[in-house]
């Protein structure tokens, strides 16, 4: 099984508390994802996330095909870090860690994604032909939105 990594970081001119409130709310997903994604939360989500919280979504990720996604907040260290992991969805494995670090003039946002594709070599081919570029597009859209809203400095890498 091939494991893929996607890492992004940005400096944002906002407070740690404001950053936590924004990034820990799944209701902001449509603000920071491309229009084609159409994320709809299908479960009740409390005001504050916590470890063990399960959140279900519907989205249109590839070719407008609707898909269900169930994620669990596996770790939550308010206001610095949370991790959500796919429990049901298109990936064999998906983990997205969001880290917020206070700095002199705002915060450092780090997105650390680790994922694996299903279907063995076919999944690897699909990743190289479609999924990796879609993920880049999703996080480019996120970067651009954040940059326009909070003057972000950008660093990205895909492994």
Which residues are covered by each model-predicted region?
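Hydrophobic ligand-binding cavity/cleft-lining segments
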Residues: 1-50
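Short, surface-exposed coil-to-beta transition loops
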Residues: 5-7, 66-70, 92-96
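Generic structural detector for well-ordered beta-strands
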Residues: 7-13, 40, 58, 72, ...
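Beta-strand elements of well-folded, non-transmembrane domains
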Residues: 12-14, 61-63, 75, 90, ...
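A short, structured loop/turn motif at beta-sheet edges
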Residues: 15-16, 74-81, 99-108
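Glycine-rich portal/gate segments that line the openings of hydrophobic small-molecule binding cavities
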Residues: 41-88, 141-149, 153-158
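Beta-strand/loop substructures that line and gate deep hydrophobic ligand-binding cavities in soluble
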Residues: 86-137
């Amino acid at each position: 099984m091939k494991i893929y990594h996607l890492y992004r970081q940005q400096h944002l001119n906002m407070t740690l508390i404001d950053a936590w409130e924004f990034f820990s709310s799944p209701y902001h997903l449509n603000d920071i994802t491309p229009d084609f994604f159409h994320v709809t939360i299908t479960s009740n989500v409390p005001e504050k996330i916590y470890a063990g919280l399960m959140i279900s979504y519907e989205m249109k990720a590839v070719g407008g095909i609707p898909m269900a996604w169930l994620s669990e907040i596996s770790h939550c260290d308010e206001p610095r870090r949370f991790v959500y992991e796919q429990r049901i969805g298109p990936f064999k494995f998906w983990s997205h860690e969001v880290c917020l670090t206070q700095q002199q003039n705002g915060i450092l946002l780090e997105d650390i994604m680790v994922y694996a594709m299903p279907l063995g070599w076919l999944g690897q081919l699909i990743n190289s032909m479609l999924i990796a570029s879609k993920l880049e597009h999703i996080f480019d859209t996120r970067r651009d939105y954040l940059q326009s809203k909070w003057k972000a400095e950008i660093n990205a890498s895909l492994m």
